[in-house]
Amino acid sequence: MAEAGDENLYAAARDIARALGKDPSAAGDILQILSGYGASGNRGGDPRPTPSRGGSNVNFDRALTSLERQISSYIVEDRPIWSDPVDSRTFLDSVDELLAIAGDLRSMAGDKSVAVCQSRADELIQQVMFRLQEEFGFVMDRAPDSFDSDDEFPGEEDNDTSDGVIVARPITDYKIVIEALQSSVIGDLNAIAVRMVAGGFAKECSRVYSSRRREFLEESLSRLHLRGLSMEEVQESPWQDLEDEIDRWIKAVTLIFHVFFPSERLLCDRVFSDLPVSSVTDLSFMEVCRGTTTQLLNFADAIALGSRLPERLFKVVDLYEAMQDLIPKMETLFSDRYCSPLRHEALAIHKRLGEAIRGIFMELENLIRRDPPKTAFPGGGIHPITRYVMNYLRAACKSRQSLEQILDQTGNETGSDTRPLSVQIIWVLELLESNLEGKKRTYRDPSLCFLFMMNNDKYILDKAKDNELGLVLGEDWIVKHAAKLRQYHSNYRRSSWNQVVGLLRTDGPYPKLVENLRLFKSQFDEVCKVQSQWVVSDGQLREELRSSVAGIVSPAYSNFIRRLKESPEINGRRGEPFIPYTVEDVEFIIKRLFKESSS
């Protein structure tokens, strides 16, 4: 009868508390007052005694019987205990008492007389823990409903939900924290977590928590428009598609590591506060982040292990730099022993991206070596391989600091002032020039060989001036290359015009002068006809060449004509010999040398 009275008394307490507006604190006060009375309502002994260490087996038995009755009444209910604040408070009080008794029993483990009670307590704790595990999930599942309709994520007017999961919208301010759960919900979760850890169910509690939070992160990641490609899919996808995916990946990973993961860490710290050890917090945070982190890292790893085609350099460098920027954040967020494998994997992938970039430079070298001379390039203009390599290197040098770090494999232990990127690029340019030397041999006209080299070297020099590429190459390289360009210019002028101008010597007899004039016209016409079809794309170089040619031909021709007219042999003759061109005619024809393009 006394036991039935106890049940009626506690049932009455719950009814009174509900009538007072479901105030958990009021419920606790009422339960505390009424728990001191027996079934008759008189103040009496505690119906659920907590024996001292030396207490009798009978006291333990009575206490466990009372707890079994009260706890079982909650466990058998289909309705969630945490749907009612009074019930949750009462249930936690019973759990606390059960854990206290179990602790006393464990301290008396050597006493065979309490073995049966200890077994009963352990069995009841198992039942309680399983129910708390369910309740923990219930509280997390109902968390979105606890938000007011006006609650919003920063930077958005609407707060989307999908299947009860709060979904983060795109934001631009990384110095924010997502308050995914209200303080009251966090308090409930913490209360359950403290009991589950005390009951030996820390991993189970962590598992329930992390599964719910992973769902939030996965849904949020999908809203960032990442395709979630497997490593095989990355390897098979067209590079143009992957370029777009890399851009989305960089934005997503920045947001994840600067906003979402720090917010999840703070939430873990609050939910699992007041625990005797931090391992539950660290384990839970790792489990929450592991799936998302692995997905992000797998994509970067697939890119790192993919093709080394030269056109991939720039996006791979973007990935490398994004990882580089995130490493300090990872070092902070993933500092504990549970997260250290994620941190180490990120560092390894960052290293593999660097290896991929070095491999891409090697493939660029091979591309230059494999580019065959084939047939002569029309007009001796700038070869496509020259344009490709120079624009490539110029674009690459925009990431100069990263490339310096990547290419410095030895850490410059020799103390040399030579920078690894400078060495690499100069080597690529040497390969390019060697390739161009092979291509110039396809021209039968030596003058066109020199013009071809002049065109390409002028393009190389112009691309290296006044930009990051020039800073990498250094002033000495530019000065030496300018001298080489002048030498090509001199060689062209000598091979093209020395023989033509040589016909304008004035030290021969009159008949010889007349013959030389005829030969000059023939050769001059032929050279100008041919070279008017040659290509000099650079306007400045084109004018310099024309001026240079005019500078040696015009004075020689003018002097020759004057000498011819003044020759004594023409005295007494009728008129002067036939002179095909005036000096102005020669200069006009020279101005028609070369064209801007081969089209």
UniProtKB/Swiss-Prot annotation:
Residues 38-58 are annotated as: Disordered. SUPFAM superfamilies: Cullin repeat-like. Disruption phenotype: No discernible phenotype in normal conditions. Altered mannitol (drought)-promoted stomatal closure. Enhanced susceptibility to the bacterial pathogen P.syringae pv. maculicola and abnormal papilla formation, with an unusual wide halo made of vesicle-like structures upon inoculation by the fungal pathogen B.graminis hordei. Reduced sensitivity to pathogen-associated molecular patterns (PAMPs) (e.g. It holds the Pfam family Exo70_N. GO terms for molecular function: phosphatidylinositol-4,5-bisphosphate binding. Its main location: cytoplasm. It is found in: Cytoplasmic vesicle, Phagosome; Cytoplasm; Nucleus. Mostly expressed in leaves and, to a lower extent, in roots, cotyledons, internodes, flower buds, siliques and anthers. GO terms for cellular component: cytoplasm; cytosol; exocyst; extracellular exosome; nucleus; phagocytic vesicle; plasma membrane. Target of the E3 ubiquitin-protein ligase PUB22 that mediates its ubiquitination and degradation via the 26S proteasome to attenuate pathogen-associated molecular patterns (PAMP)-induced signaling, especially is response to the bacterial elicitor flg22. Keywords: Cytoplasm, Cytoplasmic vesicle, Nucleus, Plant defense, Transport, Ubl conjugation. It comes from the Eukaryota. The keyword Nucleus applies. Belongs to the EXO70 family. Component of an exocyst subcomplex specifically involved in autophagy-related, Golgi-independent membrane traffic to the vacuole. Regulates autophagosome formation and autophagy-related Golgi-independent import into the vacuole. Positive regulator of defense responses to pathogenic bacteria (e.g. P.syringae pv. maculicola), to the biotrophic oomycete H.arabidopsidis and to fungi (e.g. B.graminis hordei), especially in cell wall apposition formation related to plant defense. Required for both immediate and later responses triggered by pathogen-associated molecular patterns (PAMPs). Self interacts. Interacts with EXO70B1. Interacts with the exocyst subunits EXO70H1, SEC5A and SEC15B. Binds to SNAP33. Subunit of the exocyst complex that mediates vesicle tethering during exocytosis. Binds to PUB22. This is Exocyst complex component EXO70B2. It comes from Arabidopsis thaliana (Mouse-ear cress). The lineage of its organism: Eukaryota, Viridiplantae, Streptophyta, Embryophyta, Tracheophyta. The gene is EXO70B2.
